[in-house]
Amino acid sequence: MTVSDSGPRMQSGPTSERHAPSQDDGSSESYAPSQDDGTTGSRTLSLDDGDLHVCQDGPRDAPALLLVHGSASSLRSWDAMVPLLAGRHHVIRIDLLGHGRSGKPDDRSYATPDQARRVGEALDRLGIEHAVVAGHSSGGVVATALAELRPGLVDALALINTGPSLEAYIPQEPLPLDPSRWPPTDDQILRFGRTAFSRPDFEVPQELVDEVRLMTFHTLTTTMRETTEYLKERALPDRLAGLGKPLLVLFGADDGRWRPSSAAGYRKVPGVTVELLPGLGHTPILEDPQRTAALLLDFTTRRR
C-alpha cells in the first residue's frame, strides 16, 4: 500500500515482544493453491450493495479463521498459507469489494467500516458465529474495524505487517498511473509491489499480478484513500485497547513500507504478543508462509 499526505495511492494483560527465529527451508517462495479435497469451496455472495467472492477450505466444523487481504491485492495472496492452516481451521477468505473476483461498482462506499460491515454480513450468510480474524497490511485495518463493529463475532485478531498509524509509514516513490490507460502493465504493477518484499528478486506470483489488473482505477485509488482516512481518525492500538480481544502482531523486520519499530506501538493493547520476523519484509504470508502459519497456529491454539 502506498501512502502519501493525500492518502494511499499509486499516484493520482502483560505484553510481550520477541524476535521470532529465522528459518530457511528453501520453500519460502512456494505458492501452492489449495487443493480440492472435498473441503474446498468457492462461491459468490450477493449482498445488497455488491457481490463478494468467497473461498472456504478445511473442515466446516473446525474453528473459523478469516483471512483478510490488503490493498491492491486479493484473497489469492493467502494461497500459500491455506494448506498449512486448513488442517486445523475452517479457513475463510473474502475478496473485499473492489478487489479480486468481487464486484467493483463505482457507486458504492469503500470506506473501511463499510468494507468491514460487508465482511460481517458475508460471515452471517455462511453461518459463522465466531471467528479468529487475521489481516495482512491494510487487511488488518479492516479486521480492526470488524472487531469494532461486531465484537461478538470476532474472538481474536492477528495483524500481519499492519502499520499502527500513519506516522509509521515509510514514504514511497509515487507511481503515476493514467486512468485513460487502464489497466496497468505487469511492469507497473511489479514496480508498485517491489517494496512489499525484503528481497528485490522475489518472484511475485503471476496470479496476484493478474488479480490487481482486475481492479478498476476508481476502486484501487478509493480503497487506498479510505484506509488512510480510517488511520487518520484514530490509531489502531487506540481502537484495539478497549476491545478486550486477544491480539497477535507479526511484523517483518525488514518491512520497507511501515517502520518495523512501530510494532511496539501495539504494546498498549492489554495481553498483546508482538513477533518481529527477521529476514522478512512487508509480506511474510508470501515470503515465508511456513513460519508465518506456524506462529498464527500457535496463537489460535493457545487461545482455545
Question: Residues of each region from the PLM?
Answer:
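Conserved loop-alpha-helix segment in the C-terminal half of the alpha/beta-hydrolase fold
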Residues: 83, 247-280, 286, 291
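Active-site loop/oxyanion-hole signature of alpha/beta-hydrolase fold enzymes
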Residues: 50, 55, 92-138, 294
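Conserved alpha/beta-hydrolase catalytic His-Asp/Glu region
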Residues: 168-170, 185-242
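Long, intrinsically disordered low-complexity tandem-repeat segments
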Residues: 16-35
